[in-house]
């Protein structure tokens, strides 16, 4: 059985200015605070849920 957890690369491509407060908090929770900043995170259900809420602000790539 393969125990390797897949990672995803998330890049913020749009500003959080004018967005709802909870969307800004989700970006901070993902480690994003500036446009064009990227983070590599484990592809878990909790991360997928957060990404789904702000997918219009992000670019997502599988690693």
From Swiss-Prot:
It comes from the Bacteria. One of its GO terms (cellular component) is cytosolic large ribosomal subunit. Keywords: Ribonucleoprotein, Ribosomal protein. Gene3D superfamilies: Ribosomal protein L30, ferredoxin-like fold domain. Disulfide bonds: none annotated. GO terms for molecular function: structural constituent of ribosome. GO terms for biological process: translation. Part of the 50S ribosomal subunit. NCBIfam families: rpmD_bact. HAMAP family: Ribosomal_uL30_B (MF_01371_B). Belongs to the universal ribosomal protein uL30 family. This is Large ribosomal subunit protein uL30. It comes from Rickettsia africae (strain ESF-5). The gene is rpmD.
